[in-house]
């Protein structure tokens, strides 16, 4: 397996973890979180999910 594919796999798993943690923070906001911050986090998660989708597409193309 090529090195860049290995890096993409690590990145995919890391990103999945970040998305899950962010979603938990949205569901149960930390003390002191404001509405605007939570809305911004929701948008950030949307962007991360889009990035994850395309990263997975690239990995599929590589046969992973």
Where are these predicted regions, by residue range?
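Extended, charge-rich alpha-helical interface modules
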Residues: 1-64
